[in-house]
């Protein structure tokens, strides 16, 4: 029995070390017409959820610049990668990837538009608006293991755009 226990403990330790927690969360854009569900009434709940889940990575959708500022200031253990979809900078919704900066560092990152011209701001196929994919190569600070994380938000109207966005 002692030999079996001795073998189980290192295996469990190994499994815990290699665990990565990733969440995806559509936080809904900051819309003043949302009545009781306006951003000011949701933001603490969203921040608290992310803190309580303590993910290594959080791919968020429909994030406006003002929401991004709040989350960046509120989530002290996290930094993010991503750009606004309307100009490749700060305008329009972001699909940011928040990452635990105490555990991971960014080696490279970029954004592409879900369209036939992915390198520039563009609306794809029958989509109702610009759609983007944010991605990054991350390295675990302790283990030096690397991984790619991608985050996107497909169009809610264009069937063809949703299909082509998977290519």
PLM regions with names:
Residues 3-7, 13-74, 85-93, 166-167:
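N-terminal, active-site-proximal structural segment of metallo-dependent hydrolase catalytic domains
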Residues 8-9, 158:
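Intrinsically disordered, low-complexity segments enriched in polar/charged small residues
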Residues 30-34, 118-121, 158:
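A short acidic, helix-capping loop that chelates divalent metal ions and anchors anionic groups
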Residues 57-148, 154:
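Structured beta-strand-rich core segments of catalytic domains in phosphoester-bond hydrolases
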Residues 150-167:
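Active-site-proximal segments of metal-dependent phosphoesterases and phosphodiesterases across multiple
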């Amino acid at each position: 029995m002692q030999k079996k226990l001795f073998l189980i403990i290192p295996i469990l330790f190994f499994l815990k070390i290699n665990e990565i927690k990733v969440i995806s969360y559509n936080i809904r854009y900051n819309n003043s017409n949302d009545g009781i569900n306006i951003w000011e009434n949701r933001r603490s709940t969203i921040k608290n959820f992310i803190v309580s889940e303590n993910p290594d990575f959080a791919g968020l959708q429909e994030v406006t610049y003002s929401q991004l500022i709040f989350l960046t200031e509120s989530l002290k253990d996290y930094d993010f990668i991503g750009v606004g979809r309307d100009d490749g900078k700060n305008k329009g919704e972001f699909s940011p990837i928040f990452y635990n900066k105490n555990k991971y560092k960014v080696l490279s990152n970029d954004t592409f538009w879900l369209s036939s011209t992915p390198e520039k701001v563009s609306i794809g196929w029958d989509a109702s608006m610009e759609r983007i994919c944010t991605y990054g190569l991350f390295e675990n600070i302790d283990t030096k293991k690397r991984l790619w994380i991608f985050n996107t938000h497909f169009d809610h109207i264009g069937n063809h755009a949703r299909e082509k966005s998977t290519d």
